[in-house]
Amino acid sequence: MADPETAAKFKSKNAFPDPLNDPKCNPKSLVKKYLTPKVFESLKNKKTKLGITLWDCINSGVVNLDSGVGVYAGDEESYTLFGPLFDAIIEDYHSPYKLATGHNSDMNPAHVKAPDLDPANRYIRSTRIRVARSLKGYGLAPGVTKAHRLEIEKKVVGVLTSLTGDLAGKYYPLSGMDEKTRQQLVDDHFLFKKGDRFLEAAGINKEWPEGRGIYHNNDKTFLVWLNEEDHLRIISMEKGSDIGSVFSRLCRAVNEIDKKLGFQHTKKHGYLTSCPSNLGTGMRASVHVKIPHAKEHPDFENILTKYHIQARGIHGEHSESTGEDAGVYDISNRRRLGLSEVQCVQDMYDGVKALMELEKEAIAKKRSVFPEVLKNPEVKSLLRKYLTPELFDSLKDKKTAKGISLYDCINSGVENLDSSCGVYAGDEECYTLFAPLFDKIVEDYHSPYKLANKHTSDMNPEKVDAPNLDPEGTYIRSTRIRVARNVKGYALTPGLTRNERLDIERKVVGVLSSLTGDLAGQYYPLTGMDEATRQKLVNDHFLFKKGDRFLEAAGVNKLWPEGRGIFHNNDKTFLVWINEEDQLRIISMEKGSDIGSVFGRLCRAVNEIDKQLGFQHTDAHGYLSGCPTNLGTGMRASVHVKIPKASAHPDFQKICDEFHIQARGIHGEHSVSTGEDAGVFDISNRRRLGLSEVQCVQDMYNGVKKLLEIEKSTK
């Protein structure tokens, strides 16, 4: 709806902008509402000391008739010289605030009452608070000259690069930015784009991108945009729900910059910004929070109004929450002028707290009754088979010491009716507290194993009888053995808190980084991973993705990708996934058929990590895992082997059953071997619980050996 040519005609004559009376003009436009011919005539010949005219201020609203506000101030004086227009717009937009009242600032984080709302990370994904500021002694963004913009950049960068501690970081100028840096800032969601048509018409994009840039700290929790819509957008953010911590970091940074450079401020307007909508605090305090039930509650809008907050989808204004983000909303303060920064944050905090209480009430009500959807005929899960209404009622009110409930364990199977298992344990205690359910599922899945028997572990590679099956490489392409493990003293992955996940990452990386010899390598955290590293890990088939809908519903994906990462050795034959489905997936692999060598390397690594950290284990369950299917050894030992004749043999499935192995295509479960991979199968052990790791590997070895004998003998 931009029409710069028509606007230019009126501007060149310094005439009243008739396009504002066009039916296409937004009827809610504030410049349309308050710029009467009389007001225009009284102001049209005035200029600020920096040369800003009335037309400079209204041009964006005349060019873009769909504007909501429609004016931008070119400098501090614009707010007083053109007060008859600006004052009316400001008091309308920020109603019920009156400019005569005066604005007070408060950047003391101690004044906010904000204990962590969601330490278990069940609802709040992330927190972000930003303020807009403009330096004293310069025009606002639309009125800044090129020389002044460069001067602002130099001064601000000087202050930012002097910051220490958790605020210390690096500045990235947009001018001359190389592609690698640009891509990294895009991946981190830190890069800002050239302003839209509204900012273009206001004069904010002049000499783009010169004098613009991005500063962020080493932890990527503190960010400053230079010379975007305002001189400074100062941002503090982090995964999780510690609103107090995020505000505190912001206050320390803002107060330090203000002390050294000074911000434009008046008693009536608060901190000055180019757009009147950002006056006062210039603050937007927000969280991304999952509240699908609260959103549907009849009191939802009343709570928004009561606490002066607003809700939108997490992908920007007017966006909807869909897909994996369904039910996740961006909740932020609505007021900016006439209350302090502390009050803005408190508004948001109190409002989110009230919405979370609604959500918790709705969830508690839902979880108090048996999930009738499990009775649908298409549901074939073990959860459906064993969870009766009577059993549900006997367990529904119990919670582990870490706060895990029965419904936490069954939620994935209730949300995903095509689940085969349907339960995930949130911590070790789930296996005993909810044993009347878990025991049946475990014994069914791992039949004929009985939990009354004792599971024994054996990670001694010398006990495997596994001479190289295919030294010429005619049949076996590759060998891979992995185990799932979880560290003692923590919840299992679905029940981890943010701090626990980060602590596990730190501890495990410490151990992995101390490994020597053929196990020595490097850790690659998923958070902040640059594109070149990401692509390398993709090419090596080492990168893991965010968990699927089953893991999402189980709570495994919380605060993704924070605390997750990949370690691999220099030879690329030893790999560890940290905080994926389990806290550790430890993998040994290599081209060819030396199963004994692959298992030997795995044993050395697993035994060393176990010695330093310790793994969760019980006599009945073996090594613990979030999903009961991975209990016991947590092992999958496999080869990719070309056996077109053996796979066509009438006894193929019988042999697989006899040796407790399973066959599938090499591209994952349910895949079929076709094309150049025709006849190539992934052969792996089927049993995990009730036999040792040595026995799992021996099962796979013996089964593959038998299949190769058939392959070689079949004409």
Curated annotation (Swiss-Prot):
SUBUNIT field: Monomer.
Origin species: Anthopleura japonica
Entry EC number(s): 2.7.3.3
Approximate repeats: 1-366, 367-715
MF terms (GO), sorted A to Z: arginine kinase activity; ATP binding; creatine kinase activity
Family: Belongs to the ATP:guanido phosphotransferase family.
Residue ranges of every copy of the Phosphagen kinase N-terminal domain listed in the record: 11-95, 365-447
Catalysed conversion reaction: L-arginine + ATP = N(omega)-phospho-L-arginine + ADP + H(+)
Amino acids binding ATP: 126-130, 189, 233, 284-288, 312-317
Pfam families listed in its UniProt record: ATP-gua_Ptrans, ATP-gua_PtransN
Gene Ontology biological-process entries: phosphocreatine biosynthetic process
Entry-linked Gene3D superfamilies: ATP:guanido phosphotransferase, N-terminal domain, Glutamine synthetase/guanido kinase, catalytic domain
InterPro entries: ATP-guanido_PTrfase, ATP-guanido_PTrfase_AS, ATP-guanido_PTrfase_cat, ATP-guanido_PTrfase_N, ATP-guanido_PTrfase_N_sf, Gln_synth/guanido_kin_cat_dom
A GO cellular-component term linked to this record: extracellular space
Keywords: ATP-binding, Kinase, Nucleotide-binding, Repeat, Transferase
Chain ranges of the Phosphagen kinase C-terminal domain: 123-362, 475-714
Top-rank lineage group of the source organism: Eukaryota
Record protein name field: Arginine kinase
Name of the top EC class for this enzyme: transferase
Record-listed substrate binding positions: 68-72, 229, 275, 317
